[in-house]
């Protein structure tokens, strides 16, 4: 009911105006006092954004900030909204958007949905939507890349087959030496192989929970191709679940290449290893498609200042502020025109992640995606460690996921 009332109030201020001009027409509520949640590494940027917002528009909005991880921000909005003070604007990862919307915790984007649809990458616009409506304001994206030791691999790997060949004379499990590491059991990292030949998690671009594609012939073909990489990665995936173990071995020079994301760059810099970063190599001539994670600013449906909150969230997604965020935090904006500017003099890691971003798919944001992770981890373990036939492992995972979805309906 509250959501409907807020939407009516906002729309009354925007009637008959094109969506991009709506934000310019709305004025924040008198005495607006906004609470902003973002992760700790982004707090300095967010404080700058708030000052810039007031300065650019002549507002006198009060702001307070709290460092909160995106997954915790979404959980708090769901659990505490309506019973305790929650953020007016929070930043979350897009795969949590569906749960948040279903729980009634997020307002629609009522000021700039058309601008976002026409400006941002398709992955980002899809990530900002749920059930055909726009909720999120995209502010950055991340995906996986290949980090490699330049002392061990002087030439940047272009194919996984090159890494397999290197591993023939390098691998030594007793000495914890491996040509390649990644978190095998983590579907976020291994999905690039399941989708190698065109398979998908959910149909209709990740929105149809009744069309589960993880056991299709194409998915089976992809996972069989992944098993080739045992020759490069003979590690025990259970032992390598801990990211610090994998990254530590890479930093010690015992691992030639590791699949990781931009969140690991600072640690690799501190390790002193001479490393390079490239997009994910091809396997059997196919370009793997990684998951991308889109960071969204969302407006709480419980905000007492919905106009001010919508305006600030919109400001965070403006090209000016996306570029400033990149300059302050290295967070890559999901806008092609900005990526073209950044890539001209980008460092190696940023270049690789931008390049891989064009071969990535936004994680499905429907709530049913949450039922996929554990069964897929078990399926990957069964086929990789226990050598269970791929079709059996994937069929079993699909049956479990379908049961869980049916139970929730």
Regions found by a protein language model. Give the residues of each.
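Conserved N-terminal structural module of periplasmic/extracytoplasmic solute-binding proteins
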Residues: 11, 21-97, 284, 392, ...
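Long, aromatic- and glycine/proline-rich binding clefts that accommodate carbohydrate-like moieties
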Residues: 128, 278, 327-382, 406-408
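Extracytoplasmic/periplasmic solute-binding protein
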Residues: 135-139, 144, 164-211, 255
């Amino acid at each position: 009911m509250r959501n409907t009332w807020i939407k009516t109030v906002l729309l009354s201020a925007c009637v008959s105006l094109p969506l991009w001009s709506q934000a310019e027409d709305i004025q924040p509520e008198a005495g607006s006092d906004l609470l902003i949640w973002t992760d700790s590494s982004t707090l300095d940027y967010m404080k700058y954004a708030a000052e810039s917002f007031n300065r650019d528009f002549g507002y006198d909005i009060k702001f307070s900030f709290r460092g909160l991880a995106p997954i915790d921000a979404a959980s708090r909005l769901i659990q505490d909204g309506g019973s305790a003070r929650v953020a007016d604007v929070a930043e979350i990862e897009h795969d949590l958007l569906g749960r948040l919307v279903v729980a009634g915790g997020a307002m629609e984007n009522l000021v700039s949905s058309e601008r976002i649809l026409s400006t941002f990458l398709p992955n980002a616009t899809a990530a900002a939507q749920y059930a055909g409506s726009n909720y999120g304001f995209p502010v950055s994206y991340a995906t996986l890349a290949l980090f490699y030791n330049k002392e061990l691999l002087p030439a940047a790997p272009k194919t996984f087959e090159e890494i397999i060949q290197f591993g023939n004379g390098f691998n030594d499990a007793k000495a914890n030496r491996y040509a390649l590491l990644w978190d095998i059991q983590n579907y976020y990292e291994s999905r690039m192989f399941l989708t190698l030949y065109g398979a998908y998690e959910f149909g209709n671009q990740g929105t149809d929970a009744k069309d589960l594609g993880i056991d299709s012939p194409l998915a089976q073909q992809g996972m069989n191709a992944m098993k080739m990489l045992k020759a490069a990665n003979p590690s025990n995936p259970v032992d390598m679940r801990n990211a610090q173990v994998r990254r530590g071995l890479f930093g010690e020079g015992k691992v030639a290449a590791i699949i990781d994301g931009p969140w690991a760059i600072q640690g690799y810099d501190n390790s002193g290893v001479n490393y390079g970063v490239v997009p994910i190599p091809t396997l059997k001539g196919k370009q793997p498609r990684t998951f991308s994670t889109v960071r969204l600013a969302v407006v709480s449906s419980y905000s007492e200042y919905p106009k001010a909150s919508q305006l600030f969230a919109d400001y965070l997604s403006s090209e000016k502020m996306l570029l400033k965020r990149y300059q302050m935090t290295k967070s890559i904006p999901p806008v092609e025109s900005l990526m073209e500017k950044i890539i001209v003099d980008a460092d190696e890691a940023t270049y690789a992640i931008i390049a891989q971003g064009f071969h990535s798919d936004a994680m499905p944001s429907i709530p049913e995606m949450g039922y996929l992770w554990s069964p897929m981890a078990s399926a990957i373990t069964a086929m990789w460690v226990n050598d269970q036939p791929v079709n059996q492992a994937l069929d079993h995972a699909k049956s479990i996921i379908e049961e869980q979805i049916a139970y929730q309906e």
